A protein has these predicted regions:
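Small-molecule pocket liners
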Residues: 1, 20, 90
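Short, aromatic-enriched amphipathic alpha-helices that serve as compact interaction elements
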Residues: 1-7
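A solvent-exposed, acidic/Ser-Thr-rich amphipathic alpha-helical stretch
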Residues: 9-59
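Short alpha-helical linear motifs
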Residues: 36-41, 93, 109-112
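A short, glycine/Asx- and small/polar-enriched loop/turn
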Residues: 61-67
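Exposed beta-sheet edge and beta->alpha loop/turn motif
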Residues: 70-106
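Low-complexity, intrinsically disordered terminal/linker segments enriched in charged
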Residues: 101-120
Length: 120
């Protein structure tokens, strides 16, 4: 999470196993698609910050280990010049040292508006 604001996606291949299921707001993506999504953020936003409020890993009764991250994403649209801070929830299910299931949840409205400006 420290590398994302620096536009460094090198950690993604180390975090996820080859069969990982990654879900971003209801859309299943590959590790490569997630990396491209992160790179796109840096093309259309500046001053990106990812401030973690809580990072908790728990082992549940069924034996599964999950890490939950609650954070705030913030940035300024390069075209709109608007800024926003968006609450984010990330959930990672671990199989040993690799993630095999992940969910990224946030309100995409601000990001989608900036994407639309850049598609014109």
């Amino acid at each position: 999470m420290d590398l994302y604001p620096k536009n460094d996606q090198s950690q993604l291949k180390n975090i996820f196993n080859e069969a990982a299921s990654i879900n971003v707001n209801g859309i299943n993506v590959s590790v490569e698609e997630l990396a491209n999504f992160e790179k796109m953020h840096h093309k259309i936003f500046k001053g990106i910050k990812f401030q973690v409020g809580a990072n908790i890993t728990s082992k549940y009764e069924n034996g599964q280990i999950w890490t939950h991250v609650w954070a705030w994403w913030s940035g300024e649209g390069k075209k709109s010049k608007e800024t926003a801070t968006i609450p984010v929830h990330l959930a990672f299910n671990w199989d040993g040292l690799k993630c095999n299931n992940a969910f990224f949840m946030f309100d995409p409205t601000f990001i989608n508006k900036e994407v639309a400006l850049n598609d014109k």
